[in-house]
C-alpha cells in the first residue's frame, strides 16, 4: 500500500530544478530527441520487413513438388515468416511508448520473473553529494527491436528488463531515476510526460542535467477522452497491476478489485505477457471469457495492439458453444432457475427421458393401446400393411418434431389382429417402434414392446452419454434376437457357435429394416432437441419433480417455448450453458473422417503413384486446430463474479488441464446466490493452488463519483470497502428529476448536455426492460452516445454517464443494488442521475437510494 501511495503521489510534480516549467524549448528538444530514436526504430523495422518478405518469396520459389519432408519444411518457413511479417506490418499507435533512465546496477542479481537483471543500483552509483550519472537508457515498446549489431533499440514491454518501467516508485525506485511516457501517433512523436523516481538526486545524462517534462504520465493518461473501444494501458500500468500481469502462471491466479481498478485491462495484458514468456507452453491457446458481447467488442482490439493475435480467443459467455449465440434475454426469475446448479439434475433426467418417453407409452395396457389404435385408424380412414418392422409412419403434414427427438408419426399398424399404439410426441400425435420383427435363418423373430422396454432400461442404467450407449443397445437387441432364434443350441463346438452367431449378426444388421428400426427406436438426440422438448410443461414437470417447484417449472417451460418445435429459436446466455451441459450428457458419436477424394484422371495417367501425397501445412493445421479447439492451455475469466453455477461448469470444461486467471469483484455480482456460484467455481478450478491479488486504487472515477457510488455499496454489501479514487476533478454528480412525466425528453436533454461538455463518449444506463425505449430516446444524437441495459454496462467506461431511475435498476433482481453500483461507476469525468417519482427524490433531486 505504501508503494502504491507513492506511485499516486509521483503523478504530481517532483522537486527538480531542471523540470520544465513551460519553456517550449526544453520540451521541444526532448521531443526531437525521441523523434530521432523513433525514426531509427522504423528504419530498422523496414529492414526486417524486407527480410521477412524475402524469406517468404524464397520459400515459395522452392518447387511445388518434392518429398513430404521438404514440402513440410517449406510450409513451416512460410508460416513463420508470414507471422513475423504480419506483426511487423501492423502500424501500432504508440509503437514506442516508454523510456527509463537507469543508474549503474549490480551484476548477477536475480530480478523480476526470475531473470538475472540488475534491479538495484551499484554501491558507488550515488555520490556523497547526492549526484549521479545515468548509465543506461532503455526504450520500451510493444515488440522488441534490435539493431544490426543486435543491440536493443526497443525492449518488449513483457521482457524482464522492462519490469522497472512499471514497478518503480519513489519509495522503491531501484535503478530508475526518470520514467518517461512517450505519446506518438504513427511515426510522429506528439509529446512526453515524465515521472521522477529519485527527486532527491541531481542526475546527469551525457554531461547535462536530466530534464523532467510535464506533471506526470498517469494523470495525463487518465484525462484522455474515451471511445467505444478499449485502449491498452501498456504505457500507464501501475505497480500493483504489473505484479498481477507478471505473476507466474502455475495453478490459479485470483484477482479482486473494485470498479476502475483496471481488472479487465490487467487480464488482457496478462494474456499477452504469458504468450511472450512461454509461447510453446501456450500453443494450446488462451481463452478470455467476458460476460457480454458488448465487452468483447469493447476489448477485442487490445491484444492486437500489444503485438498478440491468433492464439488468444476472446469469447462472450453466450458464444462459448459452437453454433450457438445468445441473442435473447431471460427475466431475472427465469435466469435464477436456469443458472442454478439444480438444473444439472433436471438435464440428466431430460436427456434420458427424451429417449424413454416412447417405451412408457408403448407399455400401456393392451386395452388402452387397442382403443387408441382404433381411434387413430378411424381418424385416418385407412389401414397400412405391416412390414417386417412395426413402427409408425412419418408425421402428418404440418406436424413437426423437435430435432433429435423420437419421430412423431400419426399412425401405425401391424399384421392383422395385432395392435400398435401410436406414441404421442411433444408436438402432435406420433409413434415409436413398439415391435421389432426380423427374418433370420428362415424364422420370423419378434421382440415385443415389454422386451424392448426392458432392453432400453438396461442400457440406460449406466452413466455413459445417451448417444454413446447406442452400440450397447444394438448389441442387446441382437442378443435378444439370437436367444429367440434357438440357434445357440445347434452346435456343441464353441467355434462353430461363434461363427454362426457372427453370421447371424451380419445378416440382421445389414438389413435396411433393422437399421431403420434402430435409427427410430434409439435416435441420436441433439441438445437443441432436448431443450425444445423441455418446453412441454407436463414432460418438464416429470423431469423436474422434487427439484424445482411448480412456479419455477412453469416459468422455465414458458421461456423455452421461444426455441420453437425445431429447437432453432433464439437462445439466452443461460440457455447456452444448458446446451453445453446437454452436449456432455448426450455425447457425440464418433464420425468417420472424410476421405480425400481421388481424381480418376490421376489414376489413369499414373500421376497418383508419382506424386507424393500433400501433407497438411503448418498454417492449415494451426487454423484447423484453432477452429476445433474446445480446451485451452490458459483460461482468463473476466468479471467472474457474474458467472452462474451452470456457466462455471461450461467454462470449466474448456480448462480441465489449464492454468487460470480469475478476475472479479464480489461487490459487482449480478448473481443472486454468490455462495452457490463460489461452490461451482471451486469445482471448476479443482484443487489447484491459488495465488491472490487485490487491486485497491480506482483509476477511472473521480473522487466525487466514487463517493456517491460508495453509498450504494454500503447498502448492497455492508462492510465492503470501495477502491480509493486517485484523483478529484471538482465536478459533483448532477441530479435531474423528470418533470411533467416526460422521461424520454428529460433523458435526451441530459445526454445532449453531457455531449457538449465532454470530448468522448456518453453512456445512458437504464433498466434492462427499457433498452429499446432508451435507444429511441437518443436517436439522432450521434455515435458518441449509446444506450445500454444495466447488466450490459459491466466492464465498460465512458467519459460521462446518465443513470436513469436508480430505484428501477435496484428493483430488477435480488442483486439489483450491486447492479446499480456498477452503473454508477462507469464515468471517467461526469455523472448525471435522472430520477422519477419511483425514486422519491428530495428537493435537490437526490434519489432516496443515493442520500446519506
Q: Language model features by range: what are they?
A:
Residues 223, 285, 289, 330-340, ...:
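Hydrophobic alpha-helical scaffolding
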Residues 284, 293-321, 325-338, 583-590, ...:
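Conserved helicase motor core of SF1/SF2 NTP-dependent helicases
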Residues 1-243, 607-608, 851-852:
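Extended, charged low-complexity regulatory segments
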Residues 213-214, 320-330, 453-457, 493-498, ...:
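Short acidic (Asp/Glu) and glycine-rich catalytic loops that position anionic groups and cofactors
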Residues 2-16, 20, 24, 28-33, ...:
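P-loop NTPase Walker
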Residues 341, 345-462, 751:
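Conserved AAA+ ATPase small/helical "lid" subdomain
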Residues 376-380, 385, 395-397, 430-634, ...:
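Conserved helicase NTPase catalytic core signature
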Residues 92, 108, 113-163, 310-368, ...:
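Conserved P-loop NTPase-based nucleic-acid remodeling module centered on helicase motor cores
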